[in-house]
Amino acid sequence: MSIVFQIALAALVFFSFVMVIGVPFAYAAPQYWDQSKPLLWVGSGIWTILVIVVAVLNFFVI
């Protein structure tokens, strides 16, 4: 279970870095807003799911 937690945590950290770069770029480029908006919603949903998964796994690991 510990290795699953570590993989989920690494995925959350990596995806957070991607979102830190991607979200400001999406807001700064108004000509691509129509293309970026669905990606922001999907990215936010994935990030939220990863946070919940890490929280649940943390409960089982500790």
UniProtKB/Swiss-Prot annotation:
It is a multi-pass membrane protein. GO terms for biological process: photosynthesis; photosystem II stabilization. Gene3D superfamilies: Photosystem II PsbZ, reaction centre. The chain crosses the membrane at residues 8-28, 41-61. Keywords: Membrane, Photosynthesis, Photosystem II, Reaction center, Thylakoid, Transmembrane, Transmembrane helix. HAMAP family: PSII_PsbZ. May control the interaction of photosystem II (PSII) cores with the light-harvesting antenna, regulates electron flow through the 2 photosystem reaction centers. PSII is a light-driven water plastoquinone oxidoreductase, using light energy to abstract electrons from H(2)O, generating a proton gradient subsequently used for ATP formation. NCBIfam families: PS_II_psbZ. This is Photosystem II reaction center protein Z. It comes from Gloeothece citriformis (strain PCC 7424) (Cyanothece sp. (strain PCC 7424)). The gene is psbZ.
